């Protein structure tokens, strides 16, 4: 009886304290809060004007959060479209059972046109050559392929110039097997306090629309609003908006007003798998860049740059434990890194720390250590890091 009680107590301890390890068999994981995602979606939808449709941007594996789980929640909450960057992302969603329209915002090689048509994927188009390849495949397969014409209003990436949009739209609309369902552009500075350039882009997009309409072409879904524009540029909502970074509870920049409540949905966690004492004069990791100046308690985390916890965090990063900080010590290795636990004596082997994403160690702070943006950190995490979903 005593043995059974001890076993149950031990299992309960694992399940409660180390939920990620219990579910993934690895002592590092990214915990994704689906209830927070649902709350974010609800608040985002409250900002959308003119009964516009909304598109959930789930490219890059939903910014590292897991495309299937995020897309499923988005569709449950009424997403009209899903958006990705490359065809493999779109096909993965189709193979996972999604029937919601999927838009590829980036370029797809013409050689992959057969898959675009077969998987019913909407492609961004900005050249006649792309459209001809898709048209030929649609005719061959006896299907209709939807496309959205990309317009370059100032990003200078892909897209037709606004003054040429009418001619291209007219040509696309007459091709067999093609439905020119949408046209879109992308803001470069909607997340800045000074939105003068964003409004220049908005006017350029309106010019493109007028050129298209002058050719007698009707396009049902016009969209340019990204996350920042959803929050601060209601006049840019048109027929659909694209929610990206704000889905994940992160702000597009520190210049965007917090007009709604957003909750970050990812917390990167790791278990301390080993603790040892380091004596004065002893060093840690490659290059021996950290040398103990005192008796030091050093913990090892099974997380390294091969997981997406970049070596550039060396000498900058800290981990969080119940609001207390412990610094990374020495160079981050491919599969492990070390933490100086000396000033947090309660931290022991088996305890779980947060590398970023907690209320007291945010994604934004961790990104600032690298001189980058919050978007990049979750995108860096690769498939070796299990995603554990709650809520």
Where are these regions (language model features)?
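Intrinsically disordered, low-complexity Ser/Thr/Pro-rich tracts
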Residues: 2-3, 59
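Short, Lys/Arg-enriched N-terminal segments with co-localized hydrophobic residues
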Residues: 3-22
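A short, Lys/Arg-enriched amphipathic alpha-helix followed by its capping loop at the start of a domain
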Residues: 43-48, 77
